[in-house]
Swiss-Prot record:
Region (G1): 479-486
Gene3D superfamilies: P-loop containing nucleotide triphosphate hydrolases, Putative DNA-binding domain, N-terminal subdomain of bacterial translation initiation factor IF2, Translation factors, Translation initiation factor IF- 2, domain 3
Spans annotated as Disordered: 96-377
GO CC annotations on file: cytosol
Lineage, highest ranks first: Bacteria, Pseudomonadati, Pseudomonadota, Betaproteobacteria, Burkholderiales
Recorded superkingdom: Bacteria
The name this protein goes by in its record: Translation initiation factor IF-2
């Protein structure tokens, strides 16, 4: 369309024709009406006038970018918490736009002024929803009152070519009297832009002359009328963009200064707005944001905001209106959700989640925002610390302890590492360690009372009360080794047990019952060797009376004293049998004196302990001994119920190859029958067979009767309590519970011991002798392991890798191969396959039947592992009689051997006035001209010292050697 008249040119520029006519007249073009023709020269004059009014081209945009990095912790699919690095990049562009472009929820200022008069009329302009494909970016402003640049151009000038669409300066209002209003507009726009996730927040300030004030441009005006209003001006050859930039008359310098100040104030307000989003985020309530829109520069407070107009009236195709609606809704949703989900607490807001540029373009920003909001909710799940009461059982794994405290197992492991204990997640902790960890986490630790199935046993015992009847006494024979305990019992039993025992010493605890003329007596024979302390303690625990056997020719020995202590600890009365009185060297009076020193006072001295002189060889005094024992039993009035389920004590236990686990039981109360379900420690079973001490089958056994039973699931520990239960299922449950409890406690103790030994042996060259011990009975295993472990020293440590009852099997040899151990068999032998495997792999198998033989050989092996001792031995003394200095050789000493011998490989010590001057080696030794290996006393020789030429007449050389001597334990 050709712009031939003023009206057509005004239509092309989309501005009122009368405004354009006024600007043409101000440019010096003589036109009378809007129907007059406009030439190219007229357009050039108008363009030149507008350029003079505005000055040089200024930047049209401010681009602000921000990049923030934060960390969030989020659980993955496996439940593990992972730290994720989140980088948020946001960009915001402030653009000076044309008045014809859509305004983003902001009122535009349209003011116009005459070339000389500064007053400005104001009216909010409605945003026009222009099609996106319309190629008319260079649309002129409606009017320019003063040449005032926007704060965006002041803050960051970006000169661009004139034809560019964004190069047209946004015409700001040049109001010398009201610069603060522009600042108010910017602040209002900033308040609107903060909660909205919009990348391009564009500011628009337009101007208009007083003439169009009468035009209807109120907020109620529709966008269509606003769009059709400036459409009646013909095109000319001059570029519309240039005409638009020059569409205002020149202004005085004073007005430019005022405009510059206003622009600086607006730029300061913009900077303040950029630094304000963090404060906005801390206030989740949306009320302050709504209040910021209540009173603006162009509208009094209380009226509906102009931002609502684009949401309702703008075309759906207008991108500005659509984006404004979406972002406003999303922003309000976030604000409401934040206010609803996040109560007011003292935690600071996380500024990396939301912000003045929080959103993105299109759907991406919303999706990212939702994910960030979920992360925020995930963080809120972590609650404050709550102190709990933690019930800690005897043993507990690290994982279970962490679960009880509601923390991760890794935190418990870290805490244990701080306490100096290296553990894994499945490792079992003892109760003491677990309680320390619980207290370290700030909880209260309580020793738990487990759901113990053994409580059932107490209930059973309470129910089975019955009338007690007299029972036979249980007598334990104690004393030092070789004092004649077993021989005394042999005479009483009319049997020969001692002659059949290895080495003539008792190594098992034996139980027998003997029928005498005055009644039945049950005897327990205990070992006297020092290794069997635990066995003697068990014997004293199970007994009613103790016979203390003391040899009349030997007196009180260490194990005699130990037996006295066991008897006193158990509160058991003593009867002293002074044995071997038939020997010529017997001295019973000395024995009495020594026992009085141990607080065992005989009756004849005013005490309460009967002393009976006996001889196991001739039988003298045996009847008096039994009479005293039965007298003590009558005083004690021993009774026990008979018609109740049996209870007893495991005296000894072993693994028999043909019969399985065999236990020697002393029945203490009730009656034990064949077929009863029994529980002994961690083993249970049904009694399949019962044998007396002579090996005969019996069906029942009453109180104080020792029997051997078969049918247990495994070998019980000596000293365990045995009881009969009515329910086999209950017996199995209790046995399994005890097994797990014992295993857990053992593992926890082992771990603590390993840690202690690891720190003790750190940096030391400690040798370790590994042993695997297999014995015939449980008591021997216990005694042997205890004796061998006591042999450990600072340099050599005995480590019992495995100890069990039974023969040496192939699995034992395999364990010895893996641990490089020596296998010790005590009264047992190896299987044929185990022998072959041991020979093939060079494993040392040792068999013993006397306990102190095993102890002595292990001690000898440990001695061989000790580092040899180095000793210095002086072998000769040499005196220097002459000193020669020879070139290329050094100082040669002519010497006389005064004592001993001098060897060429010996070490020497140089003495001067009996003070050591030097210690080293001989370099050469000669007699006359010949090299010799040694020179004996009384002969002279010549010698040189290695590395020392300081020799004088009268010096002495002490010749010595270092010898290694094997050490013993």
């Amino acid at each position: 369309m050709s712009s031939n008249t003023v009206a057509q040119f005004a239509t092309e520029l989309k501005m009122p024709a009368n405004v354009l006519l006024e600007q043409l007249r101000a440019a010096g073009v003589d036109l009378k009406s809007v129907d007059d023709a406009v030439t190219d020269s007229d357009k050039a004059k108008l363009l030149e006038s507008l350029r003079r009014a505005h000055g040089a081209t200024e930047g049209k945009k401010i681009t602000l970018t921000r990049r923030q990095t934060s960390e969030i912790r989020q659980a993955d699919a496996t439940g593990r918490s992972r730290t994720i690095q989140v980088e948020v990049r946001k960009k915001r562009v402030f653009v000076k736009r044309d008045p014809a472009e859509p305004v983003r929820a902001e009122p535009a200022v349209e003011t116009a002024a005459k070339p000389v008069e500064p007053p400005v009329a104001e009216a909010p302009a409605e945003p026009v929803a222009a099609p996106a494909a319309e190629p008319q970016p260079e649309q002129p402003a409606q009017a320019e009152a003063q040449p005032e640049p926007t704060p965006a151009a002041q803050a960051e000038p970006e000169p661009q070519p004139e034809p560019q669409p964004e190069a047209a300066p946004a015409q700001a209002v040049a109001e010398p009297v009201e610069p603060a209003k522009n600042v108010s507009v910017t602040e209002t726009e900033a308040e609107q832009a903060r909660p909205e996730p919009v990348v391009h927040a564009q500011t628009e300030l337009t101007s208009q002359t007083p003439a169009p004030v009468a035009q209807p441009s109120a907020p109620a005006e529709s966008p269509k009328s606003a769009k059709a209003e400036p459409a009646a001006a013909p095109k000319t050859t001059a570029k519309p963009g240039e005409i638009r930039r020059a569409a205002a008359p020149a202004a005085p310098d004073r007005a430019r200064e005022e405009a510059r100040r206003a622009a600086e104030a607006e730029a300061a307000a913009l900077r303040e707005m950029l630094s304000r989003p963090r404060k906005v985020l801390r206030a989740p309530e949306p009320e302050p944001q709504a209040g910021a829109l209540s009173g603006t520069l162009h509208k009094p407070a209380g009226k509906p905001a102009t931002t609502a107009a684009p949401k309702k009236d703008a075309k759906p195709g207008a991108p500005g209106a659509k984006k404004t609606i979406k972002t406003a809704e999303v922003s309000s949703t976030w604000s409401d959700d934040s206010a609803r989900k996040k109560p007011a607490d003292n935690k600071p807001a996380v500024t990396t989640r939301d912000g003045w540029r929080a959103g993105g373009k299109g759907g991406r920003g919303g999706r990212n925002s939702r994910n960030q909001h979920q992360d925020r909710r995930h963080e809120q799940v972590q609650q404050e610390f709550i102190a709990r009461e933690i019930h800690v059982p005897e043993t507990i794994s690290v994982a279970d302890l962490a679960h009880k405290m509601s923390v991760k197992a890794a935190e418990v492991i870290k805490q244990l590492m701080k306490l100096g204990q290296m553990v894994t997640i499945n490792q079992v902790l003892d109760q003491e360690t677990a309680m320390i960890v619980v207290q370290e986490f700030g909880h209260t630790a309580i020793a738990a009372k487990l759901d113990d199935p053994e409580a059932f046993l107490d209930e059973t015992a309470a129910v089975t009360e019955a009338e007690a009847e007299p029972r036979a006494p249980v007598v334990t024979v104690m004393g030092h080794v070789d004092h004649g305990k077993t021989s005394l019992l042999d005479y009483i039993r009319r049997a020969k047990v001692a002659s059949g025992e290895a080495g003539g010493i008792t190594q098992h605890i034996g139980a027998y019952h003997v029928e005498t003329g005055r009644g039945v007596v049950t005897f327990l024979d205990t070992p006297g060797h020092e290794a069997f302390t635990a066995m003697r303690a068990r014997g004293a625990k199970a007994t009613d009376i103790v016979i203390l056997v003391v040899a009349a020719d030997d007196g009180v020995m260490p194990q005699t004293r130990e037996a006295i202590h066991h008897a006193k600890a158990g509160g058991v009365p003593l009867v002293v049998a002074v044995n071997k009185i038939d020997k010529p060297e017997a001295n019973p009076e000395r024995v009495k004196q020594e026992l009085v020193a141990e607080e065992v006072v005989p009756e004849e001295y005013g005490g309460d302990v009967p002393f009976v002189p006996v001889s196991a060889k001739t039988g003298a005094g045996i009847d008096d001994l039994l009479e005293n024992v039965l007298l003590q039993a009558e005083i004690l009035e021993l009774k026990a119920p008979i018609e109740v389920p049996a209870k007893g004590l495991v005296i000894e236990a072993r693994l028999d190859k043909g019969r399985g686990p065999v236990a020697t039981i002393l029945v203490q109360s009730g009656t034990l029958k064949r077929g009863d379900v029994v529980l002994a420690g961690a083993s249970f079973g049904r009694v399949r067979a019962m044998l007396d001490e002579n090996g005969k089958q019996i069906q029942t056994a009453g109180p104080s009767i020792p029997v051997e039973i078969q049918g247990l699931t495994e070998v019980p520990a000596a000293g365990d309590e045995l009881m009969v239960l009515s329910d086999e299922r209950k017996a199995r449950e209790i046995a399994l519970f005890r097994q797990g409890k014992f295993r857990d406690v053992k593992l926890a103790r082992q771990q603590a011991a390993k840690l202690e030994s690891m720190f003790d042996n750190l940096g030391e060259g400690t040798q370790t002798l590994a042993l695997i011990v297999k014995t015939d009975v449980q008591g021997s295993q216990e005694a042997l392991v205890s004796s061998l472990t006591k042999l450990s020293t600072d340099e050599v440590r005995v480590q019992v890798v495995h100890a069990a009852v039974g023969g040496i099997s192939e699995s034992d040899v395999n364990l010895a191969i893996a641990s490089n151990a020596v296998v010790i068999g005590f009264n047992v032998r190896a299987e044929q396959s185990a022998k072959k495997l041991a020979e093939t792999n060079g494993i040392d198998l040792r068999y013993y039947n006397i306990i102190y033989d095993a102890v002595d050989e292990v001690k000898a092996a440990m001695s061989g592992m000790l580092a040899p001792e180095k000793r210095e031995e002086v072998i000769g003394l040499v005196e220097v009689r002459e000193v020669y200095t020879i070139s290329r050789i050094g100082t040669v000493a002519g010497c006389m051997v005064l004592d001993g011998v001098v060897r060429r490989d010996s070490q020497v010590r140089l003495l001067r006035n009996n003070v050591v001057q030097w210690t080293g080696h001989l370099d050469s030794l000669r007699r006359f001209k010949d090299d010799v290996k040694e020179v004996k006393s009384g002969f002279d020789c010549g010698l040189t010292l290695r590395g020392n030429n300081d020799l004088q007449l009268g010096d002495q050389l002490e010749v010595f050697e270092i010898k290694e001597i094997a050490r013993t334990l």
